[in-house]
């Protein structure tokens, strides 16, 4: 009877007992009030409190998701795909590497080893003192308005056939200080051609190389390995520099016309032949058509 009364009193006071807040509860405690039913009730309540207040949160904080092979492959493909391999000509845009100003492109001393892609409106290219070894037809295929090219101080030893064939407006071509052994076919409207300080020999210049260049005024072929003066030099020439080659002789037809004693070549202002083995004094008839004698050795 006393036991029954005690049990009833406990049931009456249980609703008045409030559990501590979740932050103050010890989730490991199981309240035991001396009866199996009460123990089970409080154990269930504690379990629910743990599940609702802490378990889900803790699981979110510590959950580690291990993707299967398929999802990992998708993630790899979409988020960490490696960059494609760099192409041979995949370089920095020309106008970032060089300076582009109103149709002029300045690529001087930037260590390029090939002609960079040029803006289509380019008229002047200065690519001096680089490491360019070869010029090809595709370098200028889509740049028809070029008027001046300057490749001074490169390593050019080969110029592909047809490289300048589409440059009908080109007026000045400078290939000084390179490694050339021969000359390419030159565009017809050239007024200046400069190929000094190369390794050009006479056999590297075809007989008709200069013949049709009716606008050519300035020709610089000094400091090469020429054994003779190039043939068929155009009447338009004003300045001819051939000093410091290996020229050993000249003829009456080199600058004049042996069969026409009245012929005067009045446009030529300067011919330089010093530094060659030839003795100009031995060929007096070679200069009778000139207003000024060539510079060189006469004795």
Curated annotation (Swiss-Prot):
Q: Which domain of life is it from?
A: Eukaryota
Leader sequence range is: 1-19
Q: Which SUPFAM superfamilies match?
A: L domain-like (SSF52058)
Q: Just give the chief location class.
A: secreted
**Which InterPro entries does this entry report, sorted A to Z?**
Leu-rich_rpt (IPR001611), Leu-rich_rpt_typical-subtyp (IPR003591), LRR_dom_sf (IPR032675), Mimecan/Epiphycan/Opticin (IPR043547)
Extent of the LRR repeats: 113-132, 133-156, 157-180, 181-200, 201-226, 227-247, 248-278
Q: What is this protein called?
A: Mimecan
Organism lineage reads as: Eukaryota, Metazoa, Chordata, Craniata, Vertebrata
């Amino acid at each position: 009877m006393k036991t029954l009364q005690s049990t009833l009193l406990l049931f009456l006071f249980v609703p008045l007992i409030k559990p501590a807040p979740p932050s103050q509860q010890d989730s490991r405690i199981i309240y035991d009030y001396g009866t199996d039913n009460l123990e089970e009730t409080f154990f269930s309540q504690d379990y629910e409190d743990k599940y609702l207040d802490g378990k889900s949160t803790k699981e979110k904080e510590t959950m580690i998701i291990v993707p299967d092979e398929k999802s990992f492959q998708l993630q790899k493909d979409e988020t960490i795909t490696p960059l494609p391999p760099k192409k041979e000509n995949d370089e920095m845009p020309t106008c970032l590497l060089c300076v582009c100003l109103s149709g002029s492109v300045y690529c001087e001393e930037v260590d390029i080893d090939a002609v960079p892609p040029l803006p289509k409106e380019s008229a002047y290219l200065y690519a001096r003192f680089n490491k360019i070894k070869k010029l090809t037809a595709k370098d200028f295929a889509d740049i028809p308005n070029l008027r001046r090219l300057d490749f001074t101080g490169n390593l050019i030893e080969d110029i592909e056939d047809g490289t300048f064939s589409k440059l009908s407006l080109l007026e000045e071509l400078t290939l000084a200080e390179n490694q050339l052994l021969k000359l390419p076919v030159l565009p017809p409207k050239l007024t200046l051609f400069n190929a000094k300080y190369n390794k050009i020999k006479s056999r590297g210049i075809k007989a008709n190389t200069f013949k049709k260049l009716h606008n050519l005024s300035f020709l610089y072929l000094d400091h090469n390995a020429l054994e003779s003066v190039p043939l068929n030099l155009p009447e338009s020439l004003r300045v001819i520099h051939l000093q410091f080659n290996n020229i050993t002789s000249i003829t009456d037809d080199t600058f004049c016309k042996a069969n026409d004693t009245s012929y005067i070549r009045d446009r030529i202002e300067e011919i330089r032949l010093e530094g060659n083995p030839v003795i100009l004094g031995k060929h007096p008839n070679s200069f009778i058509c000139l207003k000024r004698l060539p510079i060189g050795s006469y004795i």
